């Protein structure tokens, strides 16, 4: 599983020019599911997304990486993006052999969303499988790639 985490001041996703998901301060999560992903990988990524200290403490000048999205009562925008598993090493067209099938990916993506909703934070999403326009006001910019493969500690 791969997730690009971006700390944002604002983010929204549109489908056919209609806003389907929108957040304020929090994290934008671009999510890809691989052929080997299971609930174990999802659980690990969920914990990381919620607990990573990616926000500054406004009361401290010394510790930029002090608060998690939970600590600041931030918001989450989750967008499926299978292209994170695109392999561009050969030829001129990306290969998506490592991406889960749409049926499997949708099921695991929905499980990921449901587990994040259990945090009590506001969670917004795009529409799985749709062509989307994502607007991201990246704060910092702060962007990280989380990756968890089966049997990868």
Curated annotation (Swiss-Prot):
SUPFAM superfamilies, sorted: DTD-like (SSF69500)
Main location: cytoplasm
One cellular component term from this protein's GO annotations in UniProt: cytoplasm
Ligase listed as a keyword: no
GO biological process, one term: D-amino acid catabolic process
Assigned EC number: 3.1.1.96
Keyword vocabulary terms for this entry: Cytoplasm, Hydrolase, RNA-binding, tRNA-binding
Pfam families given in the database record: Tyr_Deacylase
Annotated InterPro entries: Daa-tRNA_deacyls_DTD, DTD-like_sf
Compartments, record wording: Cytoplasm
Residue ranges of the motif Gly-cisPro motif, important for rejection of L-amino acids: 140-141
NCBIfam families: D-aminoacyl-tRNA deacylase
Family indicated by similarity: Belongs to the DTD family.
Oligomeric and partner information: Homodimer.
Domain comment as written in the entry: A Gly-cisPro motif from one monomer fits into the active site of the other monomer to allow specific chiral rejection of L-amino acids.
Name recorded for this polypeptide: D-aminoacyl-tRNA deacylase
Species of provenance: Trichodesmium erythraeum (strain IMS101)
The encoding gene: dtd
């Amino acid at each position: 599983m791969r997730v690009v985490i971006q700390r944002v001041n604002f983010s929204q996703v549109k489908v056919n020019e209609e806003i389907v998901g929108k957040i304020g301060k929090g994290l934008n999560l671009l999510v890809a599911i691989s052929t080997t992903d299971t609930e174990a990988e999802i659980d690990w990524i969920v914990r990381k997304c919620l607990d990573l200290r990616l926000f500054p403490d406004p009361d401290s000048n010394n510790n930029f990486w002090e608060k998690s999205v939970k600590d600041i009562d931030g918001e989450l925008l989750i967008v499926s993006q299978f292209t994170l598993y695109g392999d561009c090493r050969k030829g001129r067209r990306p290969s998506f052999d490592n991406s889960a099938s749409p049926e499997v990916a949708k099921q695991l993506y929905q499980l990921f969303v449901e587990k994040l909703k259990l945090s009590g934070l506001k969670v917004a999403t795009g529409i799985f499988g749709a062509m989307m326009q994502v607007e991201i006001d990246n704060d910092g910019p702060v962007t990280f790639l989380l990756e968890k493969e089966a049997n990868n500690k």
